[in-house]
Amino acid sequence: MPEIRVTPLGAGQDVGRSCILVSISGKNVMLDCGMHMGYNDDRRFPDFSYITQSGRLTDFLDCVIISHFHLDHCGALPYFSEMVGYDGPIYMTHPTQAICPILLEDYRKIAVDKKGEANFFTSQMIKDCMKKVVAVHLHQTVQVDDELEIKAYYAGHVLGAAMFQIKVGSESVVYTGDYNMTPDRHLGAAWIDKCRPNLLITESTYATTIRDSKRCRERDFLKKVHETVERGGKVLIPVFALGRAQELCILLETFWERMNLKVPIYFSTGLTEKANHYYKLFITWTNQKIRKTFVQRNMFEFKHIKAFDRTFADNPGPMVVFATPGMLHAGQSLQIFRKWAGNEKNMVIMPGYCVQGTVGHKILSGQRKLEMEGRQMLEVKMQVEYMSFSAHADAKGIMQLVGQAEPESVLLVHGEAKKMEFLRQKIEQEFRVSCYMPANGETVTLPTSPSIPVGISLGLLKREMVQGLLPEAKKPRLLHGTLIMKDSNFRLVSSEQALKELGLAEHQLRFTCRVHLQDTRKEQETALRVYSHLKSTLKDHCVQHLPDGSVTVESILIQAAAHSEDPGTKVLLVSWTYQDEELGSFLTTLLKNGLPQAPS
């Protein structure tokens, strides 16, 4: 019995270090290869020993797929390929291929050059890892080998994010990565067709959340920022380099222009330029409004937002600073936070999810005394606000995607256990499908029913349409035709088309039975008597008298002939195909009983 096996190596009942091992019809695929931002030791990387205890990873894995450039989805990639050892193909979209190495190098600098961490990948390892990448286009079916194929779908979330369908024969799995079912100011909504996979693996970060109106959230955000700078305070907004950062920059830029505000807004050095470059390069990945206006006005060339210098953090007076990274776990955002945390006039606005173990998660949980590096204590007096501008699907969006894809089963990853359990029950109740939520290292095995996909010729469908026999939606219907197999693909076509394609002449197998009838009339008159008798007897059948004197009932042919030895006897030749054997037998019996007497 074919089966699908799924083992989360990371993001199983957890958010961070996304890494899921999928085995489908003998093919092994690793989905994402992320790091956990809450750890600074070996726990930051997935446990790759689950993949295989012996032998090379390249021999076991058929391919690796990366859904997008966030480090909790790609951060362990150089460690995995260059330090653990993997030489096979790594698939990702073109924007992810361009942006991923930049973020990996930025994080490496923080971890190694500034913190002095050991057992970490080098700059050269990042370059060598990226040489193994195969970039894919949206909706492009990529043949990994003779049996395994993958296809990317638009996921929203960040520039270049994609959901992937993995298919082997008739078995398929869809992995969402992170996605957003709601369009925002610079990206469109996630979309997938009704692909009906055996299994849908979906993120569940906001498994129990249904977001309020986006307009209300934006108004609340602008109000809090404005009130803080009005009283002379500073606002820190920790963000990741690309994605939510651009969303909030567009929002503040528009507000500053409308209100004619002079308070400076800063963005981490270099990131504005990088964002401009990549959004221009991959403009087709943005939403329709950005694409339409890009030629006349680049939405990412900001008038009020300037590059940030670290010395600006000590400047007196109000300011707004977008700084990376988004969870306050390292880098410039953490440095600024430490400087501003002691002033109650200031505010930090956390616009996205923070994983456990990060400073962002600690302050959102209510901690106001933090132990920093070197066992130094930091008292947080500044205001802390959480305002979800997350580019993840909420509970409503997850349910919408499940309904759109129509999977046979669902598996939840990238979420917190209690919230996932609530969503799991909701999915099972509403869609009547099995839903799983394995922990890291736990394997879920799903038996699949083998099926053979069959293409149906347009001619056969048109014939059904002409006859008015098209089925109602979701109601099964039998189609009769000839099944042709070519290059391991099956097609159902009409018998005429099959003969033509195969270069065969049409042959027909008919059965003929002789019925002796006492009748002195000529053969034509006997045939006419047969026609009249059958016409009056068989009200529900098509009975015809042909010009050559023969009679037909559906596909059954009846001909009258003289008896070779007895002039007073006629021979009725009744012939039929095997499809009409029952009707042929009935007519033979009927005629053997004789014809009614003709009026004299």
Swiss-Prot record:
Gene Ontology BP annotations: RNA polymerase II transcription initiation surveillance; snRNA 3'-end processing; snRNA processing
Post-translational modification: Sumoylated; sumoylation regulates its subcellular location and is required for integrator complex integrity.
Activity regulation text: The RNA endonuclease activity is inhibited by BRAT1 that forms hyrogen bond and hydrophobic interactions with the active site.
Active site per UniProt: E203
Cofactor(s) it depends on: Zn(2+)
EC numbers on record: 3.1.27.-
GO function term, MF aspect, one: RNA endonuclease activity
UniProt short sequence motif Nuclear localization signal, positions renumbered to this chain: 469-479
Residue sites binding Zn(2+) 1 per the record: H68, H70, H157, D178
UniProtKB keywords: Cytoplasm, Hydrolase, Isopeptide bond, Metal-binding, Nucleus, Ubl conjugation, Zinc
GO CC annotations on file: cytoplasm; cytosol; INTAC complex; integrator complex; nucleoplasm; nucleus
UniProt xrefs under Gene3D superfamilies: 3.40.50.10890, Ribonuclease Z/Hydroxyacylglutathione hydrolase-like
Entry's transmembrane regions: none
Covalent link Glycyl lysine isopeptide (Lys-Gly) (interchain with G-Cter in SUMO), residues: K381, K462, K475
Domain of life: Eukaryota
Cysteine pairs bridged by disulfides in the record: none
Annotated CDD domains: INTS11-like_MBL-fold
Positions occupied by motif HXHXDH motif: 68-73
Compartment list: Nucleus; Cytoplasm
Binding of Zn(2+) 2, residues: D72, H73, D178, H414
Keyword Hydrolase (UniProt): yes
Subunit structure: Component of the Integrator complex, composed of core subunits INTS1, INTS2, INTS3, INTS4, INTS5, INTS6, INTS7, INTS8, INTS9/RC74, INTS10, INTS11/CPSF3L, INTS12, INTS13, INTS14 and INTS15. The core complex associates with protein phosphatase 2A subunits PPP2CA and PPP2R1A, to form the Integrator-PP2A (INTAC) complex. INTS11 is part of the RNA endonuclease subcomplex, composed of INTS4, INTS9, INTS11 and inositol hexakisphosphate (InsP6). Interacts with WDR73; interaction is required for the assembly of the RNA endonuclease subcomplex in the cytoplasm.
Family that this chain belongs to: Belongs to the metallo-beta-lactamase superfamily. RNA-metabolizing metallo-beta-lactamase-like family. INTS11 subfamily.
Name of the protein: Integrator complex subunit 11
Organism classification: Eukaryota, Metazoa, Chordata, Craniata, Vertebrata
